[in-house]
């Protein structure tokens, strides 16, 4: 549930609420119960997990196919639709938990990308969208998107994704990623990255390497994101007043069995504050 300060709706009268409108995206897949066979090669199923975001008079939400809808909050009428045209090959469960929202105080309401909607995808891209028009903000990354696979090394594309809403603090986007569970310990690492919300440039990253372990370097001496580390697939929280970011970590690969982790699960199942 979600806390609300609304006083006109209370435990006594909530039963009297009437449905005003319904919106259907059409983005779903029919088939067997997805919980029976969740592997990268199983039949693709959809799960609607998004919490709509209300900004002024517009509702924003994402679908299991990672399309983003902007709706009139009073009528449910579609204002625009953004389609990232995700690659769903070998993805077992298609879903999206929400989008991020940011207002650029350096711009006026008439300027392009004064209001930005930020969203990650199941094929590991990060998009910046104009909240008014649904068009990409071309000054962000590569014509509006950032490749989240950068620095992860060779891996099966089905094993890495980012479908929880990006967290935003100041002018930074904070984003983690999820991996395919119960497959292998040789999967992309759980790095959490911060990107400049205007340019899409990488500002910093947190690689959850356990204390005492040395980072892995490439031939040029740059640190690589260590494979198989604890990831942050869920929803990140921020506290602008304290300038803190709270990361809810999951289990280190391969999820429910820890016998092959070799100490890489130091940050597993924890809350980490950065």
Residues covered by each model-derived region:
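Aromatic (tryptophan-biased) beta-strands that constitute blades/sheets of beta-rich domains
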Residues: 1-43, 47, 77-86, 135-155, ...
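Short, solvent-exposed loop/turn and secondary-structure capping segments
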Residues: 2-4, 32-35, 64, 71-74, ...
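Inter-blade boundary loops/turns of WD-repeat beta-propellers
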Residues: 11-14, 73, 131, 197, ...
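Repeat-blade elements of multi-bladed beta-propeller folds
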Residues: 44-67, 92-125, 158-184, 191, ...
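Generic hydrophobic/packing signal
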Residues: 56, 63, 72-75, 82, ...
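Beta-propeller blade signature
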Residues: 129-134, 188-202, 261-274
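Active-site cavity-forming subdomains of large catalytic enzyme subunits
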Residues: 164, 190-191, 196, 212, ...
């Amino acid at each position: 549930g979600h806390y609300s300060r609304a006083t006109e709706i209370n435990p006594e009268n909530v039963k009297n609420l009437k449905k005003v409108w319904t919106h259907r995206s059409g983005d779903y897949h029919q088939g067997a119960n997805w919980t029976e066979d969740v592997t990268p090669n199983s039949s693709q199923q959809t799960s609607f997990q998004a919490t709509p975001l209300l900004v002024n008079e517009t509702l924003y939400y994402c679908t299991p196919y990672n399309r983003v809808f902007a709706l009139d909050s009073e009528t449910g009428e579609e204002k625009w639709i953004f389609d990232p045209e995700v690659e769903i090959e070998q993805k077992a469960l298609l879903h999206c938990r929400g989008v991020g929202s940011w207002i650029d105080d350096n711009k006026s309401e008439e300027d392009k990308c004064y209001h930005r909607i930020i969203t990650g995808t199941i094929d590991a891209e990060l998009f910046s969208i104009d909240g008014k028009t649904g068009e990409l903000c071309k000054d962000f990354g590569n014509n509006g998107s950032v490749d989240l696979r950068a620095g992860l090394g060779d891996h099966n594309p089905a094993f890495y994704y980012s479908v929880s809403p990006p967290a935003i603090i100041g002018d930074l986007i904070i984003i983690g990623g999820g991996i395919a569970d119960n497959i292998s310990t040789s999967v992309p690492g759980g790095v959490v990255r911060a990107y400049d919300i205007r340019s899409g440039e990488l500002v910093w990253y947190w690689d959850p390497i356990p204390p005492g372990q040395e980072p892995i370097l490439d031939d040029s001496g740059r640190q690589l994101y260590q494979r198989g580390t604890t990831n942050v697939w869920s929803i990140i929280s921020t506290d602008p007043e304290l300038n803190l970011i709270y990361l809810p970590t999951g289990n280190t690969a391969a999820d429910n069995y820890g016998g092959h982790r070799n100490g890489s699960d130091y940050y597993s199942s924890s809350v980490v504050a950065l």
